Amino acid sequence: MACLDVALAGLAGADFLSSSDLDQVQAEALLTLAAQLKAGSQRFDLTGRVLGLIFSKASTRTRVSFTVAMARLGGQTIDLLPLVTQVGRGEPIADTARVLSRYCDALAIRTFAQADLADYAHWASIPVINALTDEEHPCQALADFLTLREAFGHLEGLTLAYVGDGNNVAHSLMLTGALLGVNVRIGTPEGFAPDPAVLERAAALAGGRAEISVVHEPVAAVRGAHALYTDVWASMGQEQEQAERERAFRGWCLDGELLAEADSRAIVLHCLPAHRGEEISAAVIEGAQSRVFDQAENRMHVQQALLAALLAPG
């Protein structure tokens, strides 16, 4: 079995609740390991290890990529759907987390409140992984920056422009970009900006190595950027706001006109699912500069790297 980079040794047995749980060296080492796993030049053996999936929100890419990542490492997953477990009937997180710690080796949790995720981590004696909350989507951000690194061969000094709602994806892009020395420009209409506290955390993490900023005009957001990124305007749980958000985001569609304002080598990213004709045009998502499906594949590779690090012998 391959040996982990010494930079990742501190992650053994740890939780991954936020992008800011990593430092710069760990984030870079995870991306390198993910690239090696993707190329087949590294192999890890997690035979006999079990990852529990607790997903309170719908999922395609996150659920499948974690399941396949664990299988490729020799382990297995168990799907703990809230509707068919006592979680859905109100069993306290404290009880569920302690019991599952006796059965599983790690938990990947997709839920609404970051506080619930933190409760699982508090009570569990095994690693807990953020598979998406309303506040962050850190595994997605790792895949995003791996995709950017594949396109340009490096990360530091590049600019990623995100246009859309200042949501969980935007938060994790700011935090992870700050760690990796990537300038992250969030473009969003007034009233839809990211949480100021997350912006402050990202600026502190950047330490002058990257500029993390928010603008309220789409062309200003994307001008000269090396990656243009967007996401749905109404996230899960916000469906009742769809019509209002469509009005607010009129003019913010990532289309050919907006793409023309970016660096000529710019790549296009979207975490999916995409609503063609709303936040992104069909021509752009299917165009030559799109790396959307490479990005989706990279979820599996970064999560393999993460699982190998968290479940390494302590």
PLM features: residue spans?
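Phosphate-coordination loops involved in phosphoryl transfer and adenosine-cofactor binding
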Residues: 46-51, 156-158, 265
